[in-house]
A protein has these predicted regions:
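Short, structured patches in soluble enzyme cores that scaffold and shape functional sites
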Residues: 38-40, 52, 92, 112-116, ...
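An internal, acidic/charged active-site-proximal segment
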Residues: 56-172
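Short amphipathic alpha-helical "interface-anchor" segments enriched in bulky aromatics
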Residues: 196-231
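Active-site rim beta-loop-alpha module in soluble metabolic enzymes
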Residues: 184-195, 219
Length: 306
């Protein structure tokens, strides 16, 4: 679960567009959406549902924000997928009672980034309990890189931390190569109780949140999808329509690009993904597709592996 700014304006592009006021009094309006994406270790970042930030017509009401949009999106997600097992990954903005309560009410698990300064009482409890749980501090050497040397990993976890009416579990992860500094550092809170058998896996799942930003938003902004382009400067309906079509296109491309045999083809033929798509588009533009042959292909049983 994460949000992103799509484009900014020096004028109000549509009614209800959120805005910020700078120190010198200048207003900047920004189209902003929050996304529920399905992410995986293989790089998938597939949009499941979107929600836009839009201010109320009531001028006295506070502006819409990402946390308010999350509550609306969570309600819709539960309504559409009432029995779907869900593990929500979210950044440090979501480490609050509203998020924890929503997950508990919907019977969802969560792993949320835990930043310094967030939930100070929880950090204080962690500081007190750290020395008391030496058996919950784990180390391992995972692999050797020919340039950077051995990769060392260290993890520590603590269960049953009290925050308001919630029981939280904390995990901290550090990783470094012997010839590279500084080390990687991640800290997460989760409702899933940990032990030596699952602590590494919980931390790894928490770090997959980066797929939303990297394989998701960053690819759509800088990978040819033109997410931030102002195709419509005044019509929010047109902007939303393009956004939804973009998510569908990105989904189709991911399902094609991440096939194992496509990856092997790119590796063996030393062809870039961009070049492969350009060749395919050129082929479709210049060749007539035979309906009989197409139907024959559609009727064949295929198993896709990722």
């Amino acid at each position: 679960m994460d949000g992103t700014g799509l484009c900014s304006y020096t004028y109000e592009p549509y009614e209800g567009c959120p805005y910020k006021v700078s120190k010198n009094g200048n207003k900047t309006w920004q189209a902003y959406a929050i996304e529920a994406k399905l992410v995986g270790a293989n790089g998938f970042s597939i949009s499941m549902m979107s929600c836009w930030l839009e201010n109320s017509e009531n001028m006295d009401a506070k502006q819409d924000c990402e946390l308010k949009a999350f509550s609306r999106l969570a309600g819709e997600l539960k309504k559409v997928y009432p029995r779907l097992p869900v593990l929500l990954l979210a950044d440090g903005l979501y480490a609050n009672q509203t998020f924890f309560g929503t997950c508990l009410k919907n019977d969802w698990h969560f792993i949320v980034t835990f930043k310094d300064g967030n939930l100070k009482t929880v950090w204080e409890e962690i500081g007190l309990l750290r020395p008391l749980h030496p058996g919950q501090k784990l180390d391992r050497v995972k692999e050797k890189n020919p340039v950077r040397g051995w990769l060392s990993e260290q993890l520590q976890y603590i269960n049953d931390l009290d925050y308001a009416k919630y029981k939280l579990n904390w995990v901290e992860y550090k990783a470094w190569y012997e010839r590279k500094e500084p080390h990687e550092y991640f800290s997460h809170l989760t409702d899933i109780r940990m032990d030596k058998s699952n602590a590494w896996e919980i931390s790894r799942h928490g770090r997959l949140r980066w797929c939303i930003e990297n394989e998701g938003f960053n690819t759509q902004k800088n990978g040819g999808y033109n997410l931030e382009h102002k195709f419509s400067r005044k019509n929010i309906g047109a902007k939303k329509n393009y956004y939804e079509l973009l998510q569908i296109a990105h989904l189709i491309n991911q399902l094609a690009e991440k096939l194992l045999h496509v990856k092997e083809h790119l590796k063996n033929c030393k062809v870039t993904l961009v070049a492969l798509w350009e060749d395919m588009m050129a082929c479709m533009r210049n060749q007539t597709i035979d309906n009989q042959e197409l139907n024959q292909v559609m009727e064949e049983y295929k198993q896709l592996r990722y």
